[in-house]
Design a protein with these regions (language model features):
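Cys-dependent protein tyrosine phosphatase-like superfamily
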Residues: 1-123, 136-183
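Short cysteine clusters
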Residues: 126
Length: 183
């Protein structure tokens, strides 16, 4: 079983393209008895404190849907993040899928780049920190000017070979700047 004590929350950092930092992680505080990587019983308070104090996070970007927050026993994530000094932002995306609203993704990616340019630290999370977090992290890198191969290499270095997880997510990241510019 993975807990906040046995497996402290870590962040996979994207390349240093800005004075600030942007990273990817799994859902803080999650309770997931049948997770693919084993059982998770985490402490939300410990995870949020570690994100703030050890990793220097100022912004927490949550990509989970409402039902996932309930299922993972972190329905109060927004309030708890704020009480730990984190600015909380959300863009719910269906698990294993791509974002429904291109405009919302473009705006979020630009905001994250702006925060990092202003020496702030943002941490993006989904359930496991690979699929949806990797997709949005990839869009941030594409917005910052990286080409698709460099973006995928940076995501692999940050979170591993399955980041983003699906072909649909990888294609979304690959085509993001061209599609965003056309709209």
């Amino acid at each position: 079983m993975r807990t906040s004590e046995t497996h402290p929350i870590e962040v996979g950092w994207l390349p240093d393209l800005w004075p600030g930092r942007v990273g990817l992680t799994f859902a803080p505080g999650k309770h997931q008895p049948g997770g693919l990587s084993g059982a998770w019983v985490r402490d939300l308070e410990l995870d949020l404190k570690r994100l703030r104090t050890v990793h220097g996070a100022q912004h927490l970007v949550c990509l989970l849907e409402d039902h996932e927050l309930v299922k993972l026993a972190i329905a109060d994530l927004a309030q708890r993040a704020k009480s730990n000094g984190l600015e909380f932002h959300r863009l719910p995306i269906q698990d294993g899928s791509i974002p429904a609203e291109l405009g919302a993704v473009r705006a979020l990616a630009q905001r994250i780049c702006s925060w990092a340019a202003a020496r702030q630290t943002a941490v993006i999370h989904c359930m496991g920190g690979l699929g949806r977090a990797g997709t949005i992290g990839g869009c941030v890198l594409r917005t910052a000017g990286l080409d698709a191969p460099a973006t995928f290499e940076a995501l692999r270095e940050a979170r591993g070979v399955k980041c983003p997880e699906t072909n649909e997510q990888r294609l979304y990241v690959q085509q993001f700047t061209a599609v965003a510019a056309a709209h």
